[in-house]
């Protein structure tokens, strides 16, 4: 090889070697059994999602919920005037580094305006959307305001009396509570849903008064029949629960199961219109309208001439115009059979206990 070509080859080898050690990284192929790869790469990620994001803990909150509410508590928003949501989001980033959009989404879900909880923790002002609407966008954080709702007094009671442990935040500069010292079983009152890696959690809410009565009854008598005081799940969007004692008792004992909920409706004779004013928690007004329109086009719902979403500030309302000669009761039975106006609500009471996921019955 000519001297010039040798020099060029050596230079190319030097550049290639430099590329392989950029910032101390060395390019190489490692042979590793797939079981070891899963153990050292996949499992840490999976556990991070389970423990730090998706599954609620025994106080009824996910880490993102707890960080937001504690930040608002530190901002003295438990009572007094509201502040801009953007201000709260910015302050929360000191504890939650996931970005402003994720934090604001969390605030929306916990808000009174959104309506996803029986007892919301955020007293909101402005457009926070609605849980029963798929397409209703909430306003940007710079336009809305919020403060803690009155029920949060029970979330933070005696938090400064060593009732819970405090841990470092992500950069070790601040402290945050590992749990909130709730004075009632919030895990059963606030609906919660999360999808992790290889597991999920779907906890339906229950009536606060019934939960407290049942808790007191269990303290007085450990053998108390829970179903006699905790009658059934209570859903924020209302609807009628199709009661089945055997199914509910199984859900209460095992923490798993499914029950059915259907919409509430009324008939307006003068207008020959069916009005839907409560729908199952698991669906949306848009999904219902889309399904009805699809069935009408396919010729499977010939009794209906039109459907409109007339939801306004007074509440949810879907108006269904009937053709003459069609009985509203029979039409509704058909709608329940063919559309999400009758839907299933799944239960999977998967909760983190000391960092370990565990499916628990209501008694536990």
Say what each PLM segment does:
Residues 2-255, 317-319:
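Catalytic phosphate-handling regions of large nucleic-acid enzymes and associated NTPases
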Residues 226-246, 253-364:
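Charged, surface-exposed alpha-helical interface/stalk elements
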């Amino acid at each position: 090889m000519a001297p010039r070509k040798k020099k060029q080859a050596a230079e190319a080898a030097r550049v290639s070697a430099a590329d392989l050690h950029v910032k101390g990284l060395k390019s190489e192929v490692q042979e590793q059994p797939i079981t070891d790869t899963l153990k050292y790469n996949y499992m840490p990620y999976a556990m991070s999602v389970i423990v730090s994001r998706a599954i609620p803990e025994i106080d009824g909150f996910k880490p993102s919920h707890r960080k937001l509410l504690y930040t608002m508590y530190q901002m003295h928003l438990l009572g007094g005037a509201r502040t801009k949501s953007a201000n709260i989001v910015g302050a929360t980033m000191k504890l939650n580094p996931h970005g402003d959009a994720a934090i604001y989404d969390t605030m929306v879900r916990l808000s009174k305006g959104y309506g996803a909880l029986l007892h919301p923790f955020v007293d909101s002002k402005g457009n926070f959307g609605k849980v029963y609407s798929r397409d209703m966008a909430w306003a940007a954080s710079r336009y809305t305001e919020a403060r803690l709702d009155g029920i949060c007094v029970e979330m933070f009671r005696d938090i400064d009396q060593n009732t819970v442990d405090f841990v470092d935040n992500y950069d070790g500069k601040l402290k945050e509570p590992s749990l909130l010292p709730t004075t009632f079983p919030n895990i059963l009152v606030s609906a919660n849903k999360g999808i992790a890696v290889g597991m999920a959690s779907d906890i339906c809410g229950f009536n606060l008064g019934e939960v407290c009565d049942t808790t007191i009854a269990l303290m007085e008598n450990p053998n108390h029949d829970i179903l006699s005081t905790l009658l059934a799940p209570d859903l924020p969007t209302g609807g009628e629960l199709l009661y089945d004692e055997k199914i509910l008792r199984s859900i209460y004992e095992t923490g798993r199961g499914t029950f059915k909920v259907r919409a509430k409706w009324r008939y307006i004779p003068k207008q020959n219109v069916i009005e839907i004013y409560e729908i199952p928690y698991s669906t949306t007004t848009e999904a219902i309208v889309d399904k009805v329109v699809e069935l009408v086009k396919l010729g499977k719902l010939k009794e209906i001439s039109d459907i409109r979403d007339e939801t306004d500030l007074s509440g949810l309302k879907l108006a269904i115009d009937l053709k003459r000669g069609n009985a509203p009761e029979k039409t509704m039975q058909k709608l329940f059979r063919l559309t999400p106006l009758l839907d299933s609500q799944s239960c999977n009471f998967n909760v983190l206990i000391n960092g370990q996921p565990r499916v628990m019955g209501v008694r536990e």
